[in-house]
Amino acid sequence: MYLANHSPLHFYRVLVVLLVSLALTSSCSQPVPKPTGPAADYQDAKDMFKRGRFDRALEFSDGLASAAPATKFTERAQVLRAVIFTGLVKSNKELVDAYTKGADQTKNSHFKAEYDRLRHDNTQAGIGAALGLAETAHQLLEGGKVSKELILETPYPSVEGPLEVADLARVREGGWVEPDRQESAAIDSLNKGVDDALAEAVSGDRSKAREALASGSTNISGLDFALFLGNQLVEAASFFDRRHGRDPQKLKTVCDEGYEAVKAAETLLKETPDKDKEKQVEKLEYRIQTTLKNV
């Protein structure tokens, strides 16, 4: 009996029972809890951003960005929204430019009418994006201040935009692009705009942005982001100049937020002087002053 109880067969039978018990215990353990509240909203925003659903990312991050009192996700949501609105501004500016030139170049009255309509529609979309960027800047730079370090927490979009949108090049020459190609060009332009916004936000190119976000987040200098945001606000303000929306009050509103970026940058530079950054702030301030004259 002693030998039977300690035979190799008995040993392996006991080992199998232990392994099965361990597997059952593991399978019955509690699942990792899903995030709730603000954490869930921000996770949804990141998921939508990765999928290129930037409109949905804005929806999920809206309440977070304006939360009072602020949560740990409020500032992160503001940074993410600043990037998205910047991408939207870039995209709509590109589309407006293409369809404006296309309408001027074409000899076909039907093409001209369609391109004029698209120019108008994208101008309106650009105005909305510009105001969204100004609102986000107001939240992030309230009182002309910004954190020394910010967090851009999001994965890089799974679909990368092209470096150039081929169909828009054809439009600029007055050539016709079918409606389905117009839609795909708009999507390509948006993906391109967001990719370029990410690159500028991390003070580099797309490759640097992709690398920086490989782990899902990256730290950004508050000074650099204030400069980035200020310059993007200048670009956004052009939607209200005499060539586009012709709205002096909104142009001033957007430029005022640009001045808040200047103040935020200057505050940080007082703590840590940097001649090169000081020159960049001066250049930004000059750009704002010049833009205010285009009413």
Positions of PLM-derived features:
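Short coil/turn linking the two alpha-helices of tandem helical-hairpin repeats
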Residues: 87-96, 103, 166, 173, ...
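Bacterial Sec signal peptide processing site at the extreme N-terminus
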Residues: 28-44
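Residue-level recognition of tetratricopeptide repeat
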Residues: 46, 83, 90, 198, ...
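Bacterial N-terminal signal peptides
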Residues: 14-25
